[in-house]
């Protein structure tokens, strides 16, 4: 589909009174949504926001976060969403390089002295710049797992290409409703928003509450396996029929249970630089992440995954300039180790993470996939610690589900991992490393483990 106007305005023309968005329990039609966006955009314009301006949006998921984002885009702004829990020291290091003029803080304190503070205010004068699909609209921080995060910059066209690829595989129609279950400061949350806008379906945004309550009336959701395990175990009365799973290995037992309750499950592989999902498939219990979606291309060069796609970012933003993502051959080298078999991609892990123990190569992600398959594990990481005899030994750091109790993971992995792969020590994830993001810094984790293993 090709849009000739902002997607929400397009759907106002096509199906004006159809339900578009549910904000807590308030349902807005496409016409009503456009009216909300117009007056908010007018308010931002009255405060000086103009086309091309960089705006920092510090907020978690809530109804006014989404409306503000759409209104800022309609002003032509380049939006940088940030996690309210990011340390101020990190933001102080990042912000000066990102050419920002304004900051809209909906959670936390507005501590950006060099940026003009914006307020949510309505204006009787609606405001909108012309639709240009190639305009830069978002700056999304990479995970920063190995250093200072970079800001990947996407156009509307790239986001829509990402959405189109996913929806070519996963049905999402006008009568469906996708819960905004992931944060908009993460590319996975943005992916939900753009799929909704591409499909002209419905999306639900609710203030934070138990997942079962947030899912009321929703047909689609993006979840991690632990969340789906919990829903099924609690025999929750949900209206779900489709789930996009991410963040861990997908046990076939989980998808079989979901299927018995009428829920189809998909999984895949994505990157911030590619506006979310690159490969996907309906979950089938195999280790691969599926085939490239339409508009995506994959090469394997020296065991490294190379990508290019219509959804690729224009570059990394630094000091008012776009730093190219691609190499001299026009491909993005991911630093992920993988292989293609019959057109389907299998990811082994990060090339940078491989280490050796007694001469045996250990790819942490392969061990993590096994540990993460345990239904009481929220997430797990494996890092090397120095050892005089073996060179390095694997240590596991685990975040358990709240109801886990005593879990003997060492015994559980004994027949699932080679002996050299089995962690020699099991540590519980410290709260200070969970800064509210979806990904945890491996560098910080490594430092923490080394300190604890000295004791």
Swiss-Prot record:
Role played: Converts 2-succinylbenzoate (OSB) to 2-succinylbenzoyl-CoA (OSB-CoA).
HAMAP family for the chain: MenE
A Gene Ontology BP annotation from the UniProt entry: menaquinone biosynthetic process
EC numbers on record: 6.2.1.26
Keyword terms: ATP-binding, Ligase, Menaquinone biosynthesis, Nucleotide-binding
Enzyme class label: ligase
GO MF terms held by the record: ATP binding; o-succinylbenzoate-CoA ligase activity
Matches recorded under InterPro entries: AMP-bd_C, AMP-bd_C_sf, AMP-binding_CS, AMP-dep_synth/lig_dom, ANL_N_sf, MenE
Pfam families per record: AMP-binding (PF00501), AMP-binding_C (PF13193)
Protein name: 2-succinylbenzoate--CoA ligase
CDD domains in alphabetical order: OSB_MenE-like
Catalysed reactions listed for this entry: 2-succinylbenzoate + ATP + CoA = 2-succinylbenzoyl-CoA + AMP + diphosphate
Protein's pathway: Quinol/quinone metabolism; 1,4-dihydroxy-2-naphthoate biosynthesis; 1,4-dihydroxy-2-naphthoate from chorismate: step 5/7; Quinol/quinone metabolism; menaquinone biosynthesis
Family recorded in the similarity comment: Belongs to the ATP-dependent AMP-binding enzyme family. MenE subfamily.
């Amino acid at each position: 589909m090709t849009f000739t106007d902002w997607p929400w305005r397009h759907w106002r023309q096509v199906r004006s009174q159809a339900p578009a968005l549910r904000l807590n329990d308030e349902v807005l039609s496409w016409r009503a949504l456009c009216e909300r966006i117009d007056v908010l955009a007018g308010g931002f314009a009255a405060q000086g926001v103009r086309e091309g301006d960089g705006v920092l949006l510090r907020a978690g998921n809530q109804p006014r976060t989404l409306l503000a984002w759409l209104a800022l885009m309609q002003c032509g702004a380049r939006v940088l969403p940030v996690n309210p829990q990011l340390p101020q020291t990190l933001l102080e290091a990042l912000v000066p390089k990102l050419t920002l003029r304004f900051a809209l803080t909906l959670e936390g304190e507005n501590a950006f002295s060099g940026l003009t503070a914006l307020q949510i205010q309505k204006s009787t004068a609606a405001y909108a710049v012309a639709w240009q699909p190639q305009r830069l609209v978002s700056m999304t921080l990479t995970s920063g797992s190995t250093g200072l995060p970079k800001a990947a910059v996407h156009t509307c066209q790239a986001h829509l290409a990402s959405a189109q690829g996913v929806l070519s595989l996963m049905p999402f129609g006008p009568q469906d409703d996708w819960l905004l279950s992931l944060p908009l400061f993460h590319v996975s949350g943005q992916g939900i928003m753009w799929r909704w806008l591409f499909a002209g379906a419905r999306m639900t945004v609710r203030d934070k509450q138990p997942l079962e309550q947030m899912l009321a009336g929703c047909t689609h959701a993006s979840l991690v396996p632990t969340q789906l395990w919990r829903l099924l175990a609690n025999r929750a009365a949900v209206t779900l029929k489709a789930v996009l799973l991410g963040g861990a290995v997908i046990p076939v037992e989980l998808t079989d249970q979901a299927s018995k309750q009428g829920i189809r499950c998909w999984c895949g592989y994505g990157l911030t630089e590619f506006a979310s999902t690159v490969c996907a498939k309906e979950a089938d219990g195999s280790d691969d992440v599926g085939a490239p979606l339409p508009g995506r291309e994959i090469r394997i060069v020296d065991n490294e995954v190379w990508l290019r796609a219509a959804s690729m970012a224009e570059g990394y933003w630094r000091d008012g300039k776009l730093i190219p993502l691609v190499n001299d051959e026009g491909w993005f080298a991911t630093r992920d180790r993988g292989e293609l078999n019959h057109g389907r991609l299998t990811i082994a892990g990060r090339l940078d993470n491989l280490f050796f123990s007694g001469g045996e190569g250990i790819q942490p992600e392969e061990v993590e996939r096994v540990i993460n398959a345990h239904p009481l594990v929220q997430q797990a990481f494996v890092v090397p610690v120095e050892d005089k005899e073996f060179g390095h030994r694997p240590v596991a750091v685990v975040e358990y589900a709240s109801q886990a109790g005593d879990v003997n993971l060492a015994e559980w992995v004994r027949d699932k991992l080679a002996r050299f792969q089995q962690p020699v020590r099991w540590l519980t994830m410290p709260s200070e490393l969970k800064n509210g993001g979806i990904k945890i810094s491996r560098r910080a984790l490594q430092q923490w483990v080394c300190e604890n293993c000295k004791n």
